[in-house]
Amino acid sequence: MGHIMRPLKQYLPCLALPLFVAIADEPCRAQDASDVAKVIVPFVEKHCVDCHGEKKQKGDLSLHLFKDEAAILKGRKTWNRVLEQLATGEMPPSKRPKPAFNEAERFTEAVKSVFVRFDRTAKRDPGLVTMRRLNKVEYVSTIRDLLGVSIPLAEDFPADQMGHGFDNIGDILTLSPLQLERYLASAESIVKAAIVTGDVRDLPKQSFGGSQQFEGTKYGQKYDDRGRIARDDKGKQIPEKERLPALSGDSSRLFYDKGPLHKRYNDLLVAGDYRIIAKLQGHFVGDEAPKFALLADGKEVLQGVCTEKAEEYSATVRLKAGPVDLGVSLLNEFTDPADPTKRRGIILHSLTILGPTVKESQEILFAGSEKLEGDAKTRFVLERFATRAYRRPVTKDELERLMRFVQQAGKISHYRLSAESFQKLHAAKLPGDVAGRLKPMEKDPFTDEDRFVKSIRQRIKDDEFKNHFPTILDAAEKSPQPWETRIGLAVRAVLCSPSFLFRVELDSRPTEREAHPIGDYQLASRLSYFLWNTMPDQELFDLAARQQLHQNLPAQVKRMVADPRSKALFDSFAMQWLGLRRLQEFTPDPKLMPDFSRLQARGNWTDLRNDMLTETGLFFTELVRENHSILDLIDARFTYINRRLSLLYDIGDTNGNSGLPKARPINPAGKPIPDIQILERGQDSGTFARSVNPFVRVNLENTRRGGLFTQASVLTITSHPTRTSPVKRGHWMLERILGTPPPPPPPNVPSLEGQKDAARLPLRQQLESHRKNPNCAGCHARIDPLGFAFENFDLLGRFRETDGDTPIDASTEMSNGRKVNGPEEMKAIVRGEKELFSRNLTEKMLVYATGRGLDYYDVRTVNGIVAELQKGDYRFHALITAIVQSDAFRMRRGKEQP
C-alpha cells in the first residue's frame, strides 16, 4: 500500500485516485472491528472534526457521527471522498498540521478494511425494488408498441423529476393529481385514435396550381399564398394586372422559391393515418436534380428527388381531426450564374389525401379474432390486450371485470370520476395524499355516450351505489353501443389501471429477507425498458411464458442491441448521462453563428442544434450496436456529419467542399458508401430515411477530431453563450466521464464573470487571477487543465487558431506536473484512465438499468461488472450483458434489510 501514499502527490494518476478499485481489489493487512475505535475515530478527531464536525461542516462534510462500522459502511461515498483528499494532499489544508506518513497509511488501510471485509463476507443484496410509474418517454413508446398509436400524448404532462441523474428513478416517479388527470384524458384520446368507429371517407383528389404563360416565357414564378412577389423567368416583377389566375383541375404549377406551395384542406372527420400523394416533376437547372420535401402542417413527412417525368410520391402520416395544411417545398434552389433566367424548380401536378387507411392499431388490437364471435371474440381480444398492457398474464378476476365493461356498456350514461371511484374500480389505493387533494370535476370531460367505467355498477350493490358515487348525473338506460365502442371502454380502463401505468413487479415472497430471482415476466420488462425504453416484444413474452429468459440473457442482449429500438439507449441514457439535454436550452450569441446562407447551406440555430445531437446519437448508437470498445467514446476515428456540420467543422465533403482533405463516407466495415445509400435519421426510433441533407459516416484520420470531446454537442454545452469555458469543460470531464466531480465552490467566492477587474484580460489570465484565491486553487488545479487542452475549439465546436486577436494556447500542466499540449495528448491521458472511466460508466448505466441509486452494498456488484468488462476487452456488449446478469438486475429481496 505504501506506493499509493509516498510521496502523496508524485505517484498519483494525473486526474484522480481510483479509490473504488483500490478499496475493492488491493490486498489489505488483517484488520478487525476494533480498528474503528483504535485508528479511525482518533484520526478523525485529531485531524478532521475541527472543520468537519458538529460545529462546522465545511464543504457539507461532517465526520463526527461515524463511530462504528455500520455508520462507515452506509457513508461509503463520503469515506471515498475523505481518502481521495487525504491521498492527494488536499486535506488537511495547508494551514493545518499534516499527519505523519505512517499515521495516514494506517488510517487509510483501516478504512479500506471495513469495506473489503464487507464485500467479501456480506450476503448478496440486489437492493430494494420500488414500484414506479412509467415516465413520459416510456409511456409514449409503450402506447406506440401496444396499440400502434404514435401521437404526442405527453406534451401536456408535467415534466418528470430527476434523481441520481436520470428521470426513470422509482423513488421519484410517483403519481400526482395532475398526472392522474392527464392519464385519464390521454386514455380517451388514445382509444379514439386507435379504434375508428365513425364514418371514414377518402378525400377527393384536389389539384391546385396553374401553369402561367407570358409572352416569350414558358413559366412564370408562382405568387404563393404568403404574398411573395411574382416574377417572370427573366427576373422582372409581373404587374398585378398581368398576373394570370391559377387554373383549376389537373393543371400544374412551377415554383422556384424557398417557401412551400401549400393548400388548406377541409376538416378531417377523424384522426388517423392518412396517405398523402404528390405528383411532381422536376425542372432541371444545374448539376443536381430538384429535391423536395412533402409537408403536413408545416412538418416534413417525406424528402425525395424529382425526375424529368411526372411521378407520384407518397407518405403515410398520422393527422389530427380538423383542418390540415399540406404542401411541397423546394430544398435545393439554384440559379444559373451565367443565365439568371434559368432556375431550378418543381412542377406540382396534384396533391391528394386519402384516408384514414386501415389502421395498424386495430390490426394490433383485434389480431387473431377474425373468426370468433360474441363473448368468445371479446374475451380473446381483452385477454390478449391486457396481458400485453400489464406485461404479465392477466388474472381471471381482472379479465372478468373487463368483460363486464363490454357487456354492460350503455346501462349508465356517465358519471364524474373521483379519487374514490378510481380506487374502487381498480382495487388500488392512490399513494400518499393524492386522493385527498383530488377535487371533484365541475364539468364532466367525457361524452354522455362513451363512459370508460360504465360497468362500475356491477361491482357495487344498487343500494350502495348512490352512497358511493353521489356525482352520477344520469342513469338513464341507453341502447347498446357498437361492439368496437364497447371494446374501447375496456381498453380505456386498462390504460388507466395501475398495472399499466406502473411497472409492478409481483412477488410471491415479498417479505423474504434472502435475495431471490425475479419472475421471467418481470425480467422481460426490466430488459425491454433498459434497452428499448418500451414494453417487451413477442419474443421476450414467449421466453417468459416458457420461463427461459434467465438462461437466455446473453443472446437476448445481442438481439436487442441490434434492434433499431436500442437507439433509446442514446435518447434516454446517454443524453442524460452526458448532460446533452441542456443543449435544447442553449442559445449562442447570434453574432457567433455561422452564415449558412453564405456557405450555400440552409439552416438556423435549431437546425444546427439538431445536427449536433444527431451526430452524437449516430456515433453512440453505432458504438453500442457494433460492439465497439467503450474507450472509443473518448477517441474514435470516425463520426457522422451532414453538410452543415461539414461546413462547421471544415472537415470534409458532403457537398460542403471544405478545405481539408475530403472525408469519404464509409460504413462500419470501412468500405465506402455509395451516395445513393447515404441515410439520415427518420422520425421513429432508430430508423433512418433518405434525405437531401444526409448524415454520412466519415473517417477522421488526419483530422483534428475524434470521440465525444471534439463533437459540437459536447463542446457547446460546456461553453457559455458568448465564449468557451475551460472550467465547464474540465468539470464536465471530471464529473461525466471520470466520475470524480470536484466539490462545489466555497461560498462568497465571486465567479469568473463577477470579477470586473479581470474581464479585460485574456481568458487564461482571468483564470489565473481567479486561482490566486486559496479557496479556489486546489479544485481549479484539477479542473482547468482538462478544459484548456480543448481551447482550440470554440463554443460551437469550430476549430480555431486565435480567439479574436489572441493566439490560442492549448498547452497546460496537470496537477502532478505533467505537461500536455492540445486535445490529442489530453484524450490519450483520459483514455489511459480505463479504471476510472469504466467504473463510472458502469455505475451510471447500472443506475439507469435498475431505476434506483446505488448504495454501499452495490460496490461488490459494480466490481463484478467492471471485471467482466475488462475480460471482454471493454466492449459495450460485455458491459450490458454483465449488467443484466448481475444480482442487482435479475434478483430482488423483501423490504427488510438482510
Question: Across the structure, where does each feature detected by a protein language model lie?
Answer:
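Bacterial N-terminal signal peptides
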Residues: 11-25
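Low-complexity, glycine/serine/threonine/alanine-rich intrinsically disordered linker
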Residues: 28-59, 74-898
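Intrinsically disordered/low-complexity terminal segments and short unstructured peptides
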Residues: 3-4, 22, 446, 860
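A detector of low-complexity, intrinsically disordered, Ser/Thr/Gly/Pro/Ala-rich segments
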Residues: 2-3, 21, 314, 685
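Intrinsic low-complexity/disordered segments
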Residues: 7-8, 26-28
